[in-house]
């Protein structure tokens, strides 16, 4: 049984996203004083007095405008309305009733879900009720005076909202949840890929051929197999010189935050355009954050192929995106659905490697093999580097400490060699691994090694 959905609807710039953030207790939706910032449907969980529900923010409704996105926004609002158990119709209490409010009210009138009018931006208690009363004229019942930005009046609104929602609550399911962020340049097909992963009749992200359609980092919960996935679609990351101050700049910040939130990051590349600096920068941020990663080559259906094409692309990806050369590569088409299911498999495998713990005995066997193939470097004065033993100290990502006689002897080249040998012996595809080199006198190292013998 799904949680009841509450749709937030209204014309542009009346404070719908601010109300969403207030009800959900966070700041997930981008809030900016400019009409049309929200375009997709953005779902967030909310709770009031123990009653749980989902709130969905929608794009601003305008019925006479030539902007290319408006038919798509209206389609998204229609879908939100169709699945909603109740509607919060948000108006600007300071501005009073506008022609746009009347159009939205007429559009809502006679529809199935109960409608609550939210007269927003009423920060002054002495005038809030009188200003809100004007909205009785819309013929949709009692208006609730609130200030979404300060929170005043939201308690009464939530009491009224919960009263009209279904009384039965679904039992909480304890499926394990993975947070998966979908990142990439604008227009590489991230939203189309999200919609393909979600499936179903009504996609949650708006898909358009205009770059930069998605501005928020949008959370969508999907159950697949024995696991729940929190899929986070993000705004495409452009070069800094192409991003103005405003909602798109905020979207880039949210995308970077989404990487940090994720257990696994899906980096989407357009097969028809190849690798750009933005992908390299994203790969560096993923590796720096220590997140598991899956590389998805989208629009694979648009490529002319022969027997060697896939291997060529895979090699190029790993060469160009060397920060995440350990990531698996999935070739897919969000448009046709080709190999979309394999993305879930790759995400699961990467998450498993990210959480993996290796016994001390197996770890040190791999270490000894690496040392046999290539001895540690020596200093110019002839001091030989020594690696005494290794132990794992963390997961997410797997982190290993190597105890050595002198950390200065182990330069970047040899450290990369050891990582390559460990990966060759132990795997860890899809996950970064981290090595910490610690200096220790030989006698003390041998004594400690005996204490930590095979686990």
Swiss-Prot record:
InterPro entries: AAA+_ATPase, G_ENGA, GTP-bd, GTPase_Der, KH_dom-like, KH_dom-like_a/b, P-loop_NTPase, Small_GTP-bd. Residues 356-441 form the KH-like domain. Keywords: GTP-binding, Nucleotide-binding, Repeat, Ribosome biogenesis. Residues 4-169, 178-355 form the EngA-type G domain. Coiled coil: none annotated. GTP 1 binds at residues 10-17, 57-61, 120-123. GTP 2 binds at residues 184-191, 233-237, 298-301. GO terms for biological process: ribosome biogenesis. The keyword Nucleotide-binding applies. One of its GO terms (molecular function) is GTP binding. Associates with the 50S ribosomal subunit. Belongs to the TRAFAC class TrmE-Era-EngA-EngB-Septin-like GTPase superfamily. EngA (Der) GTPase family. GTPase that plays an essential role in the late steps of ribosome biogenesis. This is GTPase Der. It comes from Gloeobacter violaceus (strain ATCC 29082 / PCC 7421). The gene is der.
